[in-house]
Amino acid sequence: MEPDNPLLDLYILRQAGTGRPKICFVPTASSDAQGYIDRFYDAFQRLECTPSHLSLVQPPTVDLEDFILDKDIIYVGGGNTKSMLAVWKERSVDRYLKTAWENGVILSGLSAGSICWFEEGVTDSIPGDLTRLEGLGLLSGSHCPHYDGEADRRPSYHRLIQSGQIGGGIAADDGAALHYVDGVFHRAVSSRPEAKAYEVRAMEGHVVEAVIPTVYLGEAGRAMI
C-alpha cells in the first residue's frame, strides 16, 4: 500500500490466478485504525479485485473462519505484532489463518503482517530495544522487516543473531517483498529499484549477510515474472 506505487499490490493480486481476487485486509495490529482501513480501500478499489476487511472490534460475522476461508488473499497490516498475535489467539484467528494457508489462500502483509508468518521475528512491540518475538511458524527461520527504513533494525537483527537469541533468517528493505510457495522461499521482488532482501545468519562467531537477488517490478522487471 505504498502511495502512488501499486507494484507490490499488483504482484500480490496476480498470484491469485483469478480475474477479480477477493482480498481481505486484517488491521488488527493497528487496533483496527479506521484511517488505515481507508488507505487499504483507497489502494485496492482502483485495482482489479474485490476488497474487504476483517475487524475484530466490529466483526462482520460470527463465523470468522468461514469469512477468512472465503477469501483468495489475506493482507495483514502493520502495527503492534505482539498485541495482534494475542488477539488472534484469543479469537482463534491464528488457527483459521493456518487452515486458510493449508487450503491455498494467499497470506501476505507488511511489517507486523510480514513478521507474523515466520517462526520468529524482530519487533518493536515492546518498549525499549528491539527484541525477538515468536510468530505463527508457517515459514521457517526468522524475519526482520524495515531493514533499511529504521536505523536500529539491521544492528539489532545482527545482535540478536550473534547472541543466539534468534536464529538466522531473511531481512527485507522497505519496498522489498519475500515470496514463498508451499513454505519454500521462491523469490524476492521490490517496488523500489534499490530495495533488496538479505540472508542473515551466524557463522563461526560472526554474522554473515548476503544480498538475495531481488527483481524490481518496475520497467522491464515485470516481464521477468
What spans do the regions from the language model cover?
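Class I SAM-dependent methyltransferase SAM-binding "motif I" and its flanking Rossmann-like core
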Residues: 80-154
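Residue-level marker for well-ordered alpha-helical positions
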Residues: 38, 62, 94-95, 155
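A short acidic, amphipathic alpha-helical/loop segment
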Residues: 11, 63-67, 96
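C-terminal and late-domain segments of enzyme folds
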Residues: 1-20, 25-46, 73, 121-123, ...
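Alpha-helix/helix-capping structural signal
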Residues: 79, 112-113, 176, 183
